């Protein structure tokens, strides 16, 4: 069992009327509450923006894994030092090898933690018309290319739109 969490994106938080000031601080504080609750069932934490004093029922056994949807260097370092790894969307193999792995692995090693999990998700499609499907994926999911964190990953990978990262081909 693994719990995946993420920071969201400024534009999405604005739509909900929620501020996006200092997202890395928010992530650190959130994990300062979440991780002890999952580990021991109790927490006493007072941060700059988040506070929690609670005790919850926790069943016996190991805590569930926790991964952070992290793309930028700061978030990857937090994930590497505080969680079990990261979960990625719209990140290609070049960027994983040259940016994601070195950043999160170095943070984990510096913190004396085991090598973190890296979970990558990409659409996989079988079709008789790969070009048309890639075009449709890019049109349907164009918003990802407009979000700063994904746009940065596209640039690192050398692609311009989501369809360029999809694994698309024919059955033959």
What are these regions (language model features)?
Residues 1-172:
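Active-site-adjacent structural elements that line small-molecule/cofactor binding pockets in enzymes
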């Amino acid at each position: 069992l693994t719990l995946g969490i993420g920071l969201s994106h400024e534009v999405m938080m604005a739509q909900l009327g929620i501020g996006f000031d200092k997202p890395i601080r928010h992530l650190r504080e959130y994990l300062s509450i979440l991780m002890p609750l999952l580990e021991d069932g109790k927490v006493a934490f007072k941060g700059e923006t988040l506070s929690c004093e609670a005790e919850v029922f926790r069943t016996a056994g190991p805590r569930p894994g926790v991964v952070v949807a992290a793309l930028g260097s700061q978030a990857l370092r937090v994930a590497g030092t505080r969680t079990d790894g990261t979960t990625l969307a719209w990140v290609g193999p070049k960027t994983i090898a040259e940016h994601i792995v070195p950043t999160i692995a170095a943070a984990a090693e510096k913190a004396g933690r085991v090598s973190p999990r890296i979970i990558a998700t990409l659409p996989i499609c079988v079709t008789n018309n790969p070009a048309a499907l890639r075009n449709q994926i890019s049109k349907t999911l164009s918003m990802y290319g407009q979000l700063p964190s994904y746009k940065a990953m596209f640039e690192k990978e050398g692609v311009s739109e989501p369809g360029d990262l999809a694994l698309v081909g024919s059955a033959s």
